[in-house]
């Protein structure tokens, strides 16, 4: 299947660009040299195997040997791994399952935390620094605008459904209904106990 090599090559290119370009990250990279990290994403049949060497990281779709560390998680958790402060929290909450040498994933998260993921760096060799930075700002601004627009439309839809069209109850109506239901339940319980007492006499 040609899709698998395309995905692994794309991820490999991104990781090598951000993690192996800067000489300042050399000490963090040496801790991972010779290590194999396997990332299994729930919902995906193909694991990603990261093989670290002195000059690059190789991303493979399969690995015959045994990985030093295997990480099992959801794809939505991967962006959180850029912050090394969250690693312990993710493991405790069960969002991230680590098998094998935990030091490997700790070193990888530390390296990712030190690396600066800036899309302008990818564009700079082709467009120049100023144009790349300008394009990056426009893209970030556009993404922020779209995110806020989506959240606003979500709010509008929720208000229309609950307030205008009355297709669903509002939050206060739900709370009132829950209180009334609890009151009826308490009344039925007290009536049941009174009836049981009367029947016992």
UniProtKB/Swiss-Prot annotation:
Domain SCP2: 15-112
Keyword Cytoplasm: yes
Subcellular location field: Cytoplasm
Family annotation (InterPro entries): SCP2_sterol-bd_dom, SCP2_sterol-bd_dom_sf, UbiJ
Known pathway: Cofactor biosynthesis; ubiquinone biosynthesis
GO biological-process terms attached to the record: ubiquinone biosynthetic process
UniProt cross-references to Pfam families, sorted A to Z: SCP2
Disruption phenotype: During aerobic growth, mutant is impaired for ubiquinone biosynthesis and for growth in rich medium, but it does not present any defect under anaerobic conditions. Mutant is also impaired for Salmonella intracellular proliferation in macrophages.
Cellular component, GO annotation: cytoplasm
Superkingdom: Bacteria
Record keywords: Cytoplasm, Ubiquinone biosynthesis
Family of this protein: Belongs to the UbiJ family.
Task of the protein: Required for ubiquinone (coenzyme Q) biosynthesis under aerobic conditions. Binds hydrophobic ubiquinone biosynthetic intermediates via its SCP2 domain and is essential for the stability of the Ubi complex. May constitute a docking platform where Ubi enzymes assemble and access their SCP2-bound polyprenyl substrates. Required for intracellular proliferation in macrophages.
Name of protein: Ubiquinone biosynthesis accessory factor UbiJ
Organism encoding this protein: Salmonella typhimurium (strain LT2 / SGSC1412 / ATCC 700720)
Gene this protein is translated from: ubiJ
């Amino acid at each position: 299947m040609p899709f698998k090599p395309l995905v692994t090559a794309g991820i490999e290119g991104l990781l090598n660009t951000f993690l192996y370009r800067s000489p300042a990250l050399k000490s963090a990279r040496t801790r991972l040299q010779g290590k194999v990290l396997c990332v299994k994403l729930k919902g995906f049949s193909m694991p990603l195997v990261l093989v670290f060497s002195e000059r690059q990281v190789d991303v493979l779709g399969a690995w015959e040997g045994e990985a030093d560390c295997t990480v099992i998680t959801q794809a939505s958790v991967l962006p959180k791994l850029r912050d090394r402060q969250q690693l312990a929290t993710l493991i405790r909450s069960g969002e991230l399952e680590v098998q094998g040498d935990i030091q490997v994933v700790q070193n990888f998260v530390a390296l990712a935390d030190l690396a600066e993921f800036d899309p302008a760096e990818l564009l700079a060799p082709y467009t120049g620094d100023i144009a790349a930075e300008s394009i990056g700002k426009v893209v970030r601004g556009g993404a922020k605008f779209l995110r806020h627009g989506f959240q606003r439309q979500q709010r509008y839809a929720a208000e229309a459904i609950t307030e205008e069209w009355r297709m669903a109850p509002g939050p206060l109506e739900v709370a009132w209904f829950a209180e009334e239901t609890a009151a009826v339940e308490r009344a039925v319980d007290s009536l049941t106990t009174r009836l049981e007492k009367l029947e016992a006499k």
